[in-house]
Protein backbone atom coordinates (compact mmCIF):
# COMPACT_ATOMS: atom_id res chain seq x y z
CA UNK A 1 0.00 0.00 0.00
CA UNK A 2 1.15 3.52 -0.75
CA UNK A 3 1.35 6.32 1.79
CA UNK A 4 -0.76 9.24 0.64
CA UNK A 5 -2.12 12.61 1.67
CA UNK A 6 -4.90 12.34 -0.92
CA UNK A 7 -8.56 12.15 0.02
CA UNK A 8 -11.28 10.83 -2.26
CA UNK A 9 -13.56 13.52 -3.69
CA UNK A 10 -17.27 13.32 -4.57
CA UNK A 11 -17.85 11.74 -7.96
CA UNK A 12 -21.41 10.69 -8.83
CA UNK A 13 -23.43 10.45 -12.02
CA UNK A 14 -27.20 10.14 -12.43
CA UNK A 15 -28.66 9.15 -15.79
CA UNK A 16 -32.44 8.97 -16.22
CA UNK A 17 -33.95 8.03 -19.57
CA UNK A 18 -35.03 5.21 -21.89
CA UNK A 19 -32.96 2.08 -22.43
CA UNK A 20 -31.81 2.37 -26.06
CA UNK A 21 -29.34 -0.53 -26.30
CA UNK A 22 -28.10 -3.29 -24.01
CA UNK A 23 -24.68 -4.52 -25.11
CA UNK A 24 -23.65 -6.87 -22.30
CA UNK A 25 -21.96 -10.25 -22.42
CA UNK A 26 -20.61 -12.87 -20.06
CA UNK A 27 -16.90 -13.57 -20.19
CA UNK A 28 -13.85 -14.91 -18.41
CA UNK A 29 -10.63 -13.11 -17.55
CA UNK A 30 -7.22 -14.53 -18.42
CA UNK A 31 -6.90 -15.89 -14.91
CA UNK A 32 -10.25 -17.66 -15.12
CA UNK A 33 -12.54 -15.22 -13.31
CA UNK A 34 -16.11 -15.08 -14.62
CA UNK A 35 -17.42 -11.60 -15.38
CA UNK A 36 -20.05 -9.55 -17.14
CA UNK A 37 -19.04 -6.55 -19.23
CA UNK A 38 -20.08 -4.17 -21.98
CA UNK A 39 -22.26 -1.07 -22.07
CA UNK A 40 -25.83 0.15 -21.87
CA UNK A 41 -26.92 3.13 -23.99
CA UNK A 42 -29.55 5.36 -22.38
CA UNK A 43 -31.57 7.83 -24.46
CA UNK A 44 -31.98 11.14 -22.61
CA UNK A 45 -34.34 13.56 -24.35
CA UNK A 46 -34.70 17.21 -23.40
CA UNK A 47 -35.80 20.57 -24.79
CA UNK A 48 -33.36 23.49 -24.61
CA UNK A 49 -34.81 26.86 -25.62
CA UNK A 50 -37.31 25.05 -27.81
CA UNK A 51 -34.65 22.86 -29.43
CA UNK A 52 -35.18 19.11 -29.04
CA UNK A 53 -32.01 17.28 -28.06
CA UNK A 54 -31.54 13.53 -27.93
CA UNK A 55 -28.49 12.41 -25.99
CA UNK A 56 -27.07 8.91 -26.31
CA UNK A 57 -25.39 8.29 -22.95
CA UNK A 58 -23.16 5.22 -23.08
CA UNK A 59 -22.70 3.63 -19.65
CA UNK A 60 -19.78 1.25 -19.17
CA UNK A 61 -20.55 -1.90 -17.17
CA UNK A 62 -18.18 -4.40 -15.55
CA UNK A 63 -18.33 -6.80 -12.63
CA UNK A 64 -16.68 -10.07 -11.64
CA UNK A 65 -19.14 -12.81 -10.70
CA UNK A 66 -17.58 -13.59 -7.33
CA UNK A 67 -16.27 -11.34 -4.58
CA UNK A 68 -13.00 -12.05 -2.79
CA UNK A 69 -14.87 -13.91 -0.05
CA UNK A 70 -16.31 -16.32 -2.62
CA UNK A 71 -19.86 -15.01 -2.52
CA UNK A 72 -21.65 -13.89 -5.68
CA UNK A 73 -21.29 -10.17 -6.34
CA UNK A 74 -24.63 -8.38 -6.07
CA UNK A 75 -23.65 -6.02 -8.90
CA UNK A 76 -23.08 -9.00 -11.19
CA UNK A 77 -26.56 -10.31 -10.40
CA UNK A 78 -28.05 -6.88 -11.12
CA UNK A 79 -26.25 -6.61 -14.46
CA UNK A 80 -27.52 -10.07 -15.44
CA UNK A 81 -31.03 -8.76 -14.86
CA UNK A 82 -30.30 -5.79 -17.13
CA UNK A 83 -28.94 -8.12 -19.82
CA UNK A 84 -31.76 -10.65 -19.68
CA UNK A 85 -34.85 -8.64 -18.74
CA UNK A 86 -34.52 -4.96 -19.65
CA UNK A 87 -36.44 -3.94 -22.78
CA UNK A 88 -34.46 -1.65 -25.08
CA UNK A 89 -35.55 0.44 -28.04
CA UNK A 90 -33.27 -1.70 -30.21
CA UNK A 91 -35.13 -4.84 -29.11
CA UNK A 92 -38.77 -3.73 -29.11
CA UNK A 93 -38.65 -1.05 -31.83
CA UNK A 94 -41.17 1.22 -30.11
CA UNK A 95 -39.54 3.84 -27.91
CA UNK A 96 -42.54 4.02 -25.59
CA UNK A 97 -42.35 0.28 -24.94
CA UNK A 98 -38.71 0.42 -23.82
CA UNK A 99 -37.92 0.53 -20.10
CA UNK A 100 -37.29 3.77 -18.25
CA UNK A 101 -34.16 3.50 -16.15
CA UNK A 102 -32.22 5.38 -13.47
CA UNK A 103 -28.50 4.65 -13.58
CA UNK A 104 -26.22 5.70 -10.73
CA UNK A 105 -22.50 5.62 -11.25
CA UNK A 106 -19.43 7.80 -11.60
CA UNK A 107 -17.33 9.69 -14.12
CA UNK A 108 -14.15 7.89 -15.11
CA UNK A 109 -11.22 8.31 -17.45
CA UNK A 110 -10.98 6.52 -20.79
CA UNK A 111 -7.42 6.93 -22.00
CA UNK A 112 -5.39 5.09 -24.59
CA UNK A 113 -2.75 5.44 -27.28
CA UNK A 114 -4.18 4.97 -30.76
CA UNK A 115 -2.61 3.01 -33.58
CA UNK A 116 -0.82 6.09 -34.90
CA UNK A 117 0.75 6.78 -31.50
CA UNK A 118 -1.58 9.63 -30.50
CA UNK A 119 -2.69 9.74 -26.86
CA UNK A 120 -6.45 10.08 -26.60
CA UNK A 121 -8.29 10.92 -23.42
CA UNK A 122 -11.96 11.44 -22.61
CA UNK A 123 -14.43 11.01 -19.78
CA UNK A 124 -17.07 8.32 -19.75
CA UNK A 125 -19.81 7.11 -17.43
CA UNK A 126 -19.23 4.00 -15.36
CA UNK A 127 -22.50 2.47 -14.15
CA UNK A 128 -23.00 0.93 -10.74
CA UNK A 129 -26.71 0.63 -9.96
CA UNK A 130 -29.53 0.18 -12.50
CA UNK A 131 -33.19 0.56 -11.51
CA UNK A 132 -36.25 0.42 -13.73
CA UNK A 133 -38.58 3.31 -12.92
CA UNK A 134 -41.99 4.71 -13.85
CA UNK A 135 -42.98 7.93 -15.59
CA UNK A 136 -43.90 9.39 -12.19
CA UNK A 137 -40.45 8.45 -10.89
CA UNK A 138 -38.85 10.32 -13.78
CA UNK A 139 -40.71 13.49 -12.80
CA UNK A 140 -39.94 13.12 -9.08
CA UNK A 141 -36.24 12.65 -9.85
CA UNK A 142 -36.19 15.66 -12.19
CA UNK A 143 -35.48 13.63 -15.28
CA UNK A 144 -34.81 12.90 -18.01
CA UNK A 145 -31.22 13.93 -17.32
CA UNK A 146 -27.57 12.96 -17.39
CA UNK A 147 -25.78 14.90 -14.66
CA UNK A 148 -22.40 14.47 -12.98
CA UNK A 149 -21.76 15.97 -9.55
CA UNK A 150 -18.02 16.29 -9.21
CA UNK A 151 -15.76 17.77 -6.56
CA UNK A 152 -12.60 18.85 -8.29
CA UNK A 153 -9.49 21.00 -8.23
CA UNK A 154 -9.28 23.77 -10.84
CA UNK A 155 -6.21 23.50 -13.08
CA UNK A 156 -7.06 26.19 -15.63
CA UNK A 157 -9.82 28.57 -16.76
CA UNK A 158 -9.51 29.77 -20.35
CA UNK A 159 -11.61 31.52 -22.98
CA UNK A 160 -13.47 29.31 -25.41
CA UNK A 161 -12.62 30.38 -28.96
CA UNK A 162 -14.99 30.44 -31.91
CA UNK A 163 -14.21 29.32 -35.46
CA UNK A 164 -12.42 32.62 -36.13
CA UNK A 165 -10.22 32.33 -33.05
CA UNK A 166 -12.11 34.98 -31.07
CA UNK A 167 -13.51 34.57 -27.52
CA UNK A 168 -17.04 33.14 -27.71
CA UNK A 169 -18.01 34.32 -24.23
CA UNK A 170 -17.84 30.80 -22.82
CA UNK A 171 -15.08 29.49 -20.57
CA UNK A 172 -13.25 26.16 -20.60
CA UNK A 173 -12.66 24.64 -17.18
CA UNK A 174 -9.94 22.03 -16.77
CA UNK A 175 -9.61 20.25 -13.46
CA UNK A 176 -9.21 16.89 -11.79
CA UNK A 177 -11.16 14.67 -9.44
CA UNK A 178 -9.63 12.10 -7.09
CA UNK A 179 -11.56 8.83 -6.99
CA UNK A 180 -10.51 5.75 -5.05
CA UNK A 181 -11.87 3.39 -2.41
CA UNK A 182 -9.91 2.10 0.55
CA UNK A 183 -6.14 2.24 0.30
CA UNK A 184 -4.06 3.22 -2.71
CA UNK A 185 -1.68 0.72 -4.30
CA UNK A 186 1.50 1.69 -6.10
CA UNK A 187 -0.15 1.01 -9.47
CA UNK A 188 -3.40 2.84 -8.65
CA UNK A 189 -4.67 5.54 -11.01
CA UNK A 190 -6.86 7.73 -8.77
CA UNK A 191 -6.70 10.99 -10.74
CA UNK A 192 -9.62 11.72 -13.09
CA UNK A 193 -8.89 14.76 -15.29
CA UNK A 194 -11.92 16.49 -16.80
CA UNK A 195 -12.68 19.36 -19.14
CA UNK A 196 -16.01 21.20 -19.16
CA UNK A 197 -17.68 24.14 -20.88
CA UNK A 198 -19.03 27.03 -18.79
CA UNK A 199 -21.77 28.74 -20.80
CA UNK A 200 -21.74 32.50 -21.33
CA UNK A 201 -24.54 33.17 -18.84
CA UNK A 202 -22.46 31.59 -16.03
CA UNK A 203 -18.96 32.47 -17.20
CA UNK A 204 -18.55 35.78 -15.32
CA UNK A 205 -19.93 34.43 -12.04
CA UNK A 206 -17.71 31.38 -12.31
CA UNK A 207 -14.56 33.33 -13.11
CA UNK A 208 -15.23 35.80 -10.29
CA UNK A 209 -15.46 32.93 -7.80
CA UNK A 210 -12.67 30.59 -8.89
CA UNK A 211 -8.91 30.74 -9.30
CA UNK A 212 -6.44 28.05 -10.33
CA UNK A 213 -5.84 25.71 -7.40
CA UNK A 214 -9.29 26.16 -5.84
CA UNK A 215 -11.41 23.15 -4.89
CA UNK A 216 -15.17 23.13 -5.41
CA UNK A 217 -18.19 21.02 -6.29
CA UNK A 218 -19.60 21.31 -9.80
CA UNK A 219 -22.82 20.09 -11.37
CA UNK A 220 -22.28 19.19 -15.02
CA UNK A 221 -24.62 18.00 -17.74
CA UNK A 222 -23.28 15.13 -19.82
CA UNK A 223 -24.05 16.02 -23.42
CA UNK A 224 -23.83 13.80 -26.50
CA UNK A 225 -26.12 14.92 -29.32
CA UNK A 226 -26.21 15.98 -32.96
CA UNK A 227 -27.06 19.59 -33.72
CA UNK A 228 -29.91 20.17 -36.15
CA UNK A 229 -28.61 21.16 -39.56
CA UNK A 230 -29.20 24.74 -40.69
CA UNK A 231 -29.53 25.92 -44.29
CA UNK A 232 -25.85 26.79 -44.30
CA UNK A 233 -25.02 23.19 -43.42
CA UNK A 234 -26.66 21.79 -46.55
CA UNK A 235 -24.22 21.29 -49.39
CA UNK A 236 -24.85 22.48 -52.95
CA UNK A 237 -27.59 20.80 -54.96
CA UNK A 238 -26.45 17.38 -56.12
CA UNK A 239 -26.18 16.60 -59.81
CA UNK A 240 -28.00 13.56 -61.11
CA UNK A 241 -31.22 12.78 -62.88
CA UNK A 242 -34.87 13.41 -62.26
CA UNK A 243 -36.06 14.84 -58.94
CA UNK A 244 -33.00 15.44 -56.71
CA UNK A 245 -34.47 17.62 -53.96
CA UNK A 246 -33.65 16.18 -50.55
CA UNK A 247 -30.69 14.18 -51.85
CA UNK A 248 -28.10 16.70 -50.66
CA UNK A 249 -25.55 15.60 -48.11
CA UNK A 250 -26.27 17.24 -44.76
CA UNK A 251 -23.46 18.12 -42.41
CA UNK A 252 -24.21 17.66 -38.73
CA UNK A 253 -22.15 18.87 -35.83
CA UNK A 254 -21.89 16.36 -33.02
CA UNK A 255 -21.57 17.74 -29.49
CA UNK A 256 -19.91 15.54 -26.88
CA UNK A 257 -18.97 17.48 -23.76
CA UNK A 258 -19.45 18.21 -20.09
CA UNK A 259 -21.40 21.43 -19.49
CA UNK A 260 -21.17 23.16 -16.11
CA UNK A 261 -24.66 24.15 -14.95
CA UNK A 262 -23.82 25.19 -11.38
CA UNK A 263 -21.44 24.89 -8.48
CA UNK A 264 -20.54 25.84 -4.95
CA UNK A 265 -18.22 28.56 -3.78
CA UNK A 266 -14.59 27.39 -3.48
CA UNK A 267 -14.06 25.15 -0.46
CA UNK A 268 -12.27 26.46 2.63
CA UNK A 269 -11.59 25.52 6.27
CA UNK A 270 -9.71 22.35 5.43
CA UNK A 271 -12.17 20.97 2.89
CA UNK A 272 -10.02 22.13 0.00
CA UNK A 273 -6.99 20.37 -1.47
CA UNK A 274 -3.81 22.08 -0.25
CA UNK A 275 -0.57 22.58 -2.18
CA UNK A 276 0.94 19.34 -0.87
CA UNK A 277 -2.07 17.29 -1.95
CA UNK A 278 -2.20 18.97 -5.37
CA UNK A 279 1.50 18.22 -5.88
CA UNK A 280 0.96 14.58 -4.91
CA UNK A 281 -2.04 14.31 -7.23
CA UNK A 282 0.13 15.52 -10.11
CA UNK A 283 2.71 12.84 -9.27
CA UNK A 284 0.04 10.12 -9.40
CA UNK A 285 -1.13 11.48 -12.74
CA UNK A 286 2.43 11.52 -14.06
CA UNK A 287 2.90 7.88 -13.05
CA UNK A 288 -0.34 6.91 -14.82
CA UNK A 289 0.83 8.54 -18.05
CA UNK A 290 4.24 6.89 -17.81
CA UNK A 291 2.55 3.52 -17.32
CA UNK A 292 0.35 4.12 -20.36
CA UNK A 293 3.28 5.10 -22.56
CA UNK A 294 5.51 2.25 -21.40
CA UNK A 295 2.79 -0.26 -22.29
CA UNK A 296 2.29 1.09 -25.82
CA UNK A 297 3.39 -1.20 -28.65
CA UNK A 298 3.19 0.39 -32.14
CA UNK A 299 0.96 -1.63 -34.45
CA UNK A 300 1.76 -2.43 -38.06
CA UNK A 301 0.40 0.14 -40.47
CA UNK A 302 -2.84 -1.25 -41.90
CA UNK A 303 -3.55 -1.29 -45.62
CA UNK A 304 -6.44 0.59 -47.17
CA UNK A 305 -8.32 -2.65 -47.82
CA UNK A 306 -11.81 -2.78 -46.34
CA UNK A 307 -11.40 -6.45 -45.45
CA UNK A 308 -8.68 -8.77 -44.19
CA UNK A 309 -5.71 -7.42 -42.28
CA UNK A 310 -6.47 -3.83 -43.21
CA UNK A 311 -9.83 -3.92 -41.45
CA UNK A 312 -8.42 -4.49 -37.96
CA UNK A 313 -9.56 -1.94 -35.41
CA UNK A 314 -7.19 0.12 -33.28
CA UNK A 315 -5.59 -1.67 -30.38
CA UNK A 316 -6.30 0.45 -27.33
CA UNK A 317 -5.38 0.44 -23.70
CA UNK A 318 -7.81 1.95 -21.21
CA UNK A 319 -7.22 3.53 -17.82
CA UNK A 320 -10.05 3.33 -15.36
CA UNK A 321 -10.20 5.67 -12.95
CA UNK A 322 -22.00 7.06 -4.79
CA UNK A 323 -25.07 8.52 -3.73
CA UNK A 324 -27.87 10.73 -5.13
CA UNK A 325 -26.79 14.00 -6.76
CA UNK A 326 -26.96 16.78 -4.18
CA UNK A 327 -27.68 20.05 -5.96
CA UNK A 328 -29.21 21.92 -3.04
CA UNK A 329 -26.04 23.84 -2.11
CA UNK A 330 -25.02 25.15 -5.53
CA UNK A 331 -24.06 28.82 -5.60
CA UNK A 332 -24.02 29.61 -9.31
Predicted stretch roles:
Residues 1-9, 26-30, 132-332:
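Acidic, gly/ser/pro-rich intrinsically disordered tails
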Residues 1-28, 32, 36-38, 62-67:
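Hydrophobic, proline/glycine-rich low-complexity stretches
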Residues 2-4, 27-30, 87-96, 110-119:
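Catalytic micro-motifs at enzyme active sites that drive phosphoryl/nucleotidyl and oxygen chemistry
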Residues 10-12, 33-39, 54, 98-100, ...:
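A general secondary-structure signal for short beta-strands and their flanking turns/coil
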Residues 12-21, 96-109, 152-154, 211-226:
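OB-fold and OB-like beta-barrel modules that bind single-stranded nucleic acids
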Residues 31-81, 129, 159-198:
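OB-fold (S1/OB) nucleic-acid-binding surfaces
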Residues 69-103, 199-219:
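Short nucleic-acid-contacting surface segments enriched for D/E, G, S/T with interspersed K/R
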Residues 99-148:
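Extracellular-facing segments of soluble proteins and assemblies that are Gly/Ser/Thr-biased and enriched
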